[in-house]
Amino acid sequence: MVRIIPLKKNEAPEEVRTQIQAADDVFGIQSVSAGIQAYCPPILNASRALSAAPNESNQLSAELRSLVCMRAAQIVLCPFWIDSNAAGSSKSGSSDEKIAAVSAWRTSSIFSREEKAAFELVEAMTQTPADISEEVFSNLKLLFNNEQIVELVATIA
């Protein structure tokens, strides 16, 4: 339930209108979070910058970033982000079979070692409290360099 009515682009401060339009372009509809964050332009700008940073880093494939975001959305039960990231995964090259198997990644043979390690990290980061075991981190270090791990954590966060 939305308790703060999102600002429409024409109601928002001039300095954040391009940010709202960019968010709307990504989703194809008005972004509720961008419209709400527009009440406080520094928050909207920081949020958009953090969201864009992993895409600009390019240490990881767009497909892996979309898959881990989809898994995180599944864990927190967010239908909008599940659908949005499924579409992003499809655009970035994931097969329909792979997208459908994300929730059952542990028993699926369709995922690479890197993808499975990333899914382990997603699950560790989305528990309360977050608990990334030495085993999970050691496995990441075997498959990813430090830059990739930082990008992966930022993508999941």
Language-model features: locations:
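Hydrophobic alpha-helical segments
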Residues: 1-157
